[in-house]
Amino acid sequence: PVLNGWFGMCIVLGGIDNTSFKSPTNVSTFTAPPFPTTLGDIISGYNQFSNIREYPVNYLIMGPGMGSREETVGKANKLISIASDRKDCIAVVGPSKSDVLSGSGVAPVPLVNSDTQTSNILATCNQYTSSSYAVIDSGYKYIFDRFNNKFRYIPTNSDVAGMMARTSQNSFPWFSPAGADRGVVNNAVKLAYNPSQAQRDLLYTKRINPVVAFPGQGIILFGDKTALSYVSAFDRINVRRLFLNVETAIERAARAQLFEFNDDITRANFVKIVEPFLRDVQAKRGITDF
């Protein structure tokens, strides 16, 4: 999938909407029958990605929430659990659509009271598992769906994954994906929920990264916390992604030494592989010393 303009290795599982399609001959139209995706169906699909060797991924993207808060929490926590067990990817999750929008179908509207939206987001996301291998955001953006010729609200967790992929492409994984430079949300008309400064501060203390529309700047990811619930170096996205990068590289180097003699020559060969890599990370501002 294309993430915020960049390609990434990811998995997105969501529901299926009823959509009107035109036949190839444009003679008639038909409506796709409903195929409600249950939480059990989604979890069964996610379970495939517990196999770290068979399915390498960088991001596990939640997509939309489910029909109820409990199911939304279950979906998010399953992704977080997989990412935490794999320890080589990041789960990107967010609130349910009903937390910030009212009405169902193709034309939901934002809730009038932003304090209610804030309370709803907190009620949902506070139940998400604490993990440095997950990122929570607050956003739903309004986009034009060119495939169905209509406007619709979609979650911004795929944009956050795209920001991380874009940061790796244009900078390095240990740079923060947030802010006016690297944290811009593309292809968005407006937000369903644009938190005030007081609301942003409240969300941020609860591990939720606000997605904010600033006049003259656009829509921006205005936070770089992981879903870790306590103070740690790993409560920042860039620190977790730095270690993902370093740990993966060192693991590959160590795997190449399997079944070799456990002697000075083997250890020296390992050091010769790892030291230049760490010096390169140091030169690019990832670490200060090693």
What residue spans do the PLM features occupy?
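Structured, hydrophobic secondary-structure cores that serve as assembly/anchoring elements
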Residues: V2-F290
